[in-house]
UniProtKB/Swiss-Prot annotation:
Annotated S1-like domain residues: 1-72
NCBIfam families: infA
Organism field: Francisella tularensis subsp. novicida (strain U112)
Cell location: Cytoplasm
Family from the record: Belongs to the IF-1 family.
Keywords per UniProt: Cytoplasm, Initiation factor, Protein biosynthesis, RNA-binding, rRNA-binding
GO cellular component: cytosol
Name of the protein in question: Translation initiation factor IF-1
Gene name of this polypeptide: infA
Stored SUPFAM superfamilies: Nucleic acid-binding proteins
Length: 72
């Protein structure tokens, strides 16, 4: 699957789950479970409850995603 197929949406982190997973509420009201992308993990970027994030979602499974960016 190419990167162009992914859907990017903004959301807010609701809670932190084990194994660097997060529950994120998207701007359209849907709640997804997301994990941190590899570059964020490598650079030790911390994500806390209430942070605004950009989530990549595949069209195949709209309940899971990858946190790509954390805005201030």
């Amino acid at each position: 699957m190419a990167k162009e197929d992914c859907i990017e949406m903004e959301g807010v982190v609701l809670e932190a789950l084990p194994n660097t997973m997060f529950r994120v509420e998207l701007e359209n009201g849907h709640i997804v479970t997301a994990h941190i992308s590899g570059k964020m993990r490598k650079n030790y970027i911390r994500i806390l409850t209430g942070d605004k994030v950009v989530v990549e979602i595949t069209p195949y499974d709209l309940t899971k995603g990858r946190i790509k960016f954390r805005s201030k």
